[in-house]
Amino acid sequence: MRQTVTGAIGAGFAVGRPAIVALLQRKWARELDYRLIKELWAFTGNRIAVRFAYEWHDDSGNWFRSYGNENWHYNDAGLMEYRYGLPNDLSIKESDRKYHWDCSGPRPADHSSLTDLGL
């Protein structure tokens, strides 16, 4: 499996499960109190496109909202074979945050969508 990775953790490719796990561990160690919303954009056959926005802060307390799109391609076994994503990190004030649910659990089912939030 190949996964394209770009953004805050640097451009590059992670190939194979161990490399992807290591990449995600580095990402999540940097992006603290991470909260994510994705919306389906399009799908056909074994491909899905979503748009996303997530909020997080670094270890200095600086807040960010990261926006972008992801394209997913699944193999015949139903496993993700390719993931292409490009987040754009925007520095925000803590008072401009829109995601306030407890990040130790999933986003509440009644939480506003990206469209509802104007994102």
Where are these regions (language model features)?
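Short, cysteine-centered beta-strand-loop-beta hairpins and adjacent loop/turn segments enriched
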Residues: 29-33, 56-65
